[in-house]
């Protein structure tokens, strides 16, 4: 690809997760950490840090994309870890870990929440991104996803997510104003840091 366009950049996206042990049993701790570290397998192979027979090289990754949602932290073979719980790992710490591991620019390739929690989730993610940036992580963007409400992927529930509603009886999509206000607020904060 770079022969055709030397300026092309390879941008990838993988989930960012945290998996905690359900108890302090040594085997449970080891298994949880092994599962958690599995999130790095793709980037390790692409960059040549593991499985060198696959031909990976650091030049194959220009930007690290990370998908992060409220349900991306859980106990091994168990439930989601709620934000604020002592086992919940701050997103900023997770971003710094990835930045130090790969020394590449990062962007949040997918993030968002459902219902009335959408603005608070974006506020949290942006605060954590700024925290990671203050510790040296190069984070170049955040992608709110999905941008519109949608029917559930594996059931018929209606997922009120993103900035815009489903198409209403007037044939239009309408913005969710609390999230629109939070987006503007976060844009102003980031602009003030530039």
Map each language-model feature to its residues.
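Active-site region of glycoside hydrolase catalytic domains
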Residues: 1-118, 127, 131-194
């Amino acid at each position: 690809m770079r022969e055709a366009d030397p300026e092309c950049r390879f941008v990838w996206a993988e989930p960012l997760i945290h998996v905690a042990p359900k108890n302090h049993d040594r085997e449970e701790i080891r298994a949880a950490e092994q599962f958690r570290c599995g999130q790095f397998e793709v980037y390790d192979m692409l960059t040549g840090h593991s499985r060198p027979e696959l031909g990976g090289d650091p030049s194959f990754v220009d930007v690290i994309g990370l998908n992060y949602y409220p349900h991306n932290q859980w106990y091994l073979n168990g439930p989601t870890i709620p934000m604020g719980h002592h086992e919940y790992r701050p997103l900023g710490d997770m971003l710094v870990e990835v930045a130090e591991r790969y020394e590449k620019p990062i962007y949040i390739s997918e993030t968002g929440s459902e219902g009335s929690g959408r603005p608070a989730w974006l506020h949290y993610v942006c605060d954590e991104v700024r925290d990671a940036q203050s510790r040296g992580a190069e984070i170049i963007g955040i992608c709110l996803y999905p941008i519109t409400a949608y029917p559930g992927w594996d059931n018929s529930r209606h997922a009120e997510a993103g900035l815009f509603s489903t198409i209403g009886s007037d044939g239009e999509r309408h913005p969710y104003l609390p999230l629109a206000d939070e987006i503007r607020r976060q844009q102003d904060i980031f602009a003030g840091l530039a």
